[in-house]
A protein has these predicted regions:
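AAA+ P-loop ATPase motor domain of ring mechanoenzymes
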Residues: 1-139, 147-272
Length: 272
């Protein structure tokens, strides 16, 4: 009965609320939500390093109610979170699809899943966000199988006919189909945090975790992290649930550990 009136994502949310309220009524704690569409607790587009004014882009989309964006850059740089924030600014539902949701081992099934995703977004008036879109938009000139070409063709066809807001994100800009790139109204590069953004996020998270503000030594350490992203802060906050962070020094150390597993951390960062 619920599913007859709601789309798949709204149905899941309604069921979660129903189960949670039932658990509370029975004297248990509420169901912990793991909503993948939820924004980080600390979110501000000013703390996203992009090559355009993200707030201005959002304002333009609010007015136009239509647009096709390609967000590219390193993992954790804030691409998916920006799509979530855009949906909030537009006041529309968010429909997130990942490559694993759309890819199928059966011939022709991936194309059907792509068409279904756009149809679902159209019916719900939702912003459609497809993550890892490079899985479907590889340059057709290098295709070795017919289905690789047909998947790109289906994605392009659906993009052309979709009148809402479509956001695609990828970590791999190289090798994307040139015709596909031309279909996007705007291509936005996301990058590692600038030093001023890293310091701002550090201050916000110290406040959110009930910690004292960072001292100059800790500020200097955070400013030297060249591969720091908002995703690193989010990972450390998740760690805090089972590995409590008790000081700004510990927070910076945890962020340094996140960056240490990445490549290219041996160059200095300055205020840009």
């Amino acid at each position: 009965l619920i599913q007859a009136d709601l789309g798949p994502q709204k149905t899941a949310a309604a069921l979660e609320r129903l189960i949670s309220s039932t658990m509370e009524a029975q004297g248990h704690g509420p169901l912990l939500s793991h909503d993948p569409n939820r924004l980080p607790e600390v979110y501000d587009p000013d703390f996203i390093h992009a090559d355009v004014d993200l707030a201005a882009v959002a304002a333009g989309l609010v007015a136009a109610r239509s647009g096709r964006l390609c967000l590219y850059g390193p993992p954790g740089a804030g691409k998916t979170a920006y799509g979530r924030w855009l949906a909030q600014q537009l006041g529309v539902p968010l429909l997130v699809k990942r490559a694993s949701d759309l890819k199928s081992k059966w011939l022709g099934e991936s194309e059907k899943n792509i068409a279904k995703a756009f149809r679902e977004a159209r019916n719900e008036g939702a912003l459609l966000l497809i993550d890892e879109v490079d899985s479907f938009l590889q340059d057709r000139r290098g295709a070795q199988h017919n289905w690789e070409v047909s998947e790109v063709n289906e994605m392009l066809t659906q993009m052309e006919s979709f009148s809402g807001v479509f956001v695609a994100s990828t970590n791999l800009m190289e090798g994307l189909d040139q015709a596909a790139l031309r279909r996007f109204d705007l291509k936005v590069k996301f990058d590692f945090l600038r030093a001023d953004q890293a310091l701002g996020l550090l201050s916000r998270h110290c406040e959110g975790l009930g910690l004292q503000q960072p001292l100059p030594e800790e500020q200097a350490r955070i400013s030297r992290l060249v591969s720091l992203t908002p995703g690193d802060f989010a990972a450390v906050v998740r760690q805090h649930r089972f590995r409590p962070i008790t000081s700004a020094t510990a927070l910076v150390s945890a962020l340094e550990a996140e960056c240490a597993v990445k490549h290219g951390t041996n160059r200095a960062i300055g205020f840009l």
